[in-house]
Amino acid sequence: MKIGFVGATGYGGTELVRILSHHPHAEECILYQTSGEGNVYSEGYPHLTGLADLKPIDMNTIKHEIDIMFLAAPPGVSSELTPKLADAWVTVIDLSGDLRIKEPAEYEKWYKRTAAPKAVIQEAVYGLAELNQLAIQQAKLIANPGCFPTAVLLGLAPLAKKKLLDESFVIVDAKTGVSGAGRKASMGTHFSELNDNFKIYKVNEHQHTPEIEQALNEWQPGLGPITFSAHLVPMTRGIMATMYTRLTCDLTADDLHDLYSEFYQDSYFVRVRPKGQYPQTKEVYGSNFCDIGVTLDERTNRVTIVSVIDNLMKGAAGQAVQNFNLMNGWDEETGLTIITPIYA
């Protein structure tokens, strides 16, 4: 299969190229690149020398030579390119936030930019692989979930699907490594600003909030707004989302753990920790796994869920390849199982 990339110079795009360079069904990889045109890709990314010695070509040529396009560009680019690719019958997996929010007005409120055409948004299937497999298998356009929503929704899905979340009490406290801010330098990601520091950002206005609420309300209609806080920590990769909620019925701690274990028993990339154990970001570093720990505080009757992912893998490129596999009828682990966590 011939694969195209837009945005292969960012961290998520680079991960896509890395994974697909050894994917058994990737016959050829072709780049569209707006910066550094004419350069061999691996010259800018020496770690891919011999694996991705690719030269970018123009969009009019690329769209007629590929079977699928991965869009890993900043918000706004996908809104423009997706209709053109659809006209050329190219399957698209979009890693930006352009197609995730179904209501254009809601997108424009949180992203502060014009939404994609509504017909394109409505066609896009939300690519949360473990929860939407059938629709993904039939899709031609995938809206790959955001990094925070992936960690949060996988953590809350077992409760929301059973209508067990307290409608007015869902709190998400999330931490991310600096690669989540992208490759472009800024004052906030400068080493001297970030090192030995820990800060909250986009308080009450993080663009992943409506994406999380949208999915939760599909599973459990009537849920109120959630409280979502994002923090930047001085590490390169990783997300830890700690979620707090109350339940709508009485469960014991054992019942709760059994519910999670059974919910994900057939999900290769979601690993529920034994009761009393909680995951760390290092345990999924460089992999497509999401590890989850869950407990019930019987003193307060509140549930705590801890979910960890690698933001560039399960939170971006890894999940995109998982969706690529599902769309083509292959095992969802194809090309991803050799990428095991790097602990030390």
Curated annotation (Swiss-Prot):
Pathway: Amino-acid biosynthesis; L-arginine biosynthesis; N(2)-acetyl-L-ornithine from L-glutamate: step 3/4. It is an enzyme of class 1 (oxidoreductase). Keywords: Amino-acid biosynthesis, Arginine biosynthesis, Cytoplasm, NADP, Oxidoreductase. Its EC number is 1.2.1.38. InterPro entries: AGPR_AS, AGPR_type-1, NAD(P)-bd_dom_sf, NAGSA_dehydrogenase, Semialdehyde_DH_NAD-bd. Its main location: cytoplasm. The active site is at 147. It is found in: Cytoplasm. GO terms for biological process: L-arginine biosynthetic process. The keyword Manganese does not apply. One of its GO terms (molecular function) is N-acetyl-gamma-glutamyl-phosphate reductase activity. It catalyses: N-acetyl-L-glutamate 5-semialdehyde + phosphate + NADP(+) = N-acetyl-L-glutamyl 5-phosphate + NADPH + H(+). The keyword Cytoplasm applies. SMART domains: Semialdhyde_dh (SM00859). It holds the Pfam family Semialdhyde_dhC_1. One of its GO terms (cellular component) is cytoplasm. Catalyzes the NADPH-dependent reduction of N-acetyl-5-glutamyl phosphate to yield N-acetyl-L-glutamate 5-semialdehyde. Belongs to the NAGSA dehydrogenase family. Type 1 subfamily. HAMAP family: ArgC_type1 (MF_00150). This is N-acetyl-gamma-glutamyl-phosphate reductase.
